Amino acid sequence: MKRLLLLAAMQSAILVGAQTRSDGHLFYEDFATKNNFSVNWTVTDANNDSKTWEYIDETSSPDADGGTGLAKYLYERNNAADDYLTTREPVTLKTGTHCLSFYYRTSTTRNKESMEVLYGKSKDFSTMK
């Protein structure tokens, strides 16, 4: 068994769906409320450009899985993103038993956007795979 800290390292604008539930998921987050975002996630602005992850309740534009709450990172044209959205508590995944799945979308189809999901045994981003 590995103790994994789930992390999304952003290189562009994305929307990710958040909330712990008792429906068989080891960890499930749909960002239904701002409290979920604050309690379950840590935001790190590693390049200190003040452009980083934030919670948005956007009823006019549903998120990737159809809800309205989302974690959003806005594209910064002049500075490559180096920002992290990490689970506050480690999530333990058992090899061959658990899998990671998530929804995300970009805000435009004009520019290619990318996202990286990292995992590791500590909160030190440089040690994550």
Write out the residue ranges for each language-model feature.
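Short beta-strands within extracellular/lumenal beta-sheet-rich domains
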Residues: 78-99
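Bacterial Sec-dependent N-terminal signal peptides
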Residues: 1-26
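Short beta-strand segments enriched in hydrophobic/aromatic residues
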Residues: 73-75, 104-106, 119-121
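Hydrophobic beta-strand positions in extracellular immunoglobulin-like domains
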Residues: 33, 89, 104-106
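Extended, low-complexity, turn-rich repeat/linker tracts enriched in Gly/Pro/Ser/Thr and Asp/Glu
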Residues: 92-96, 105-113, 123-125
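Beta-strand signatures of extracellular beta-sandwich domains
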Residues: 114-118
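Extracellular glycan-recognition surfaces and repeat-rich motifs
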Residues: 20-73
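Beta-propeller fold detector
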Residues: 128-129
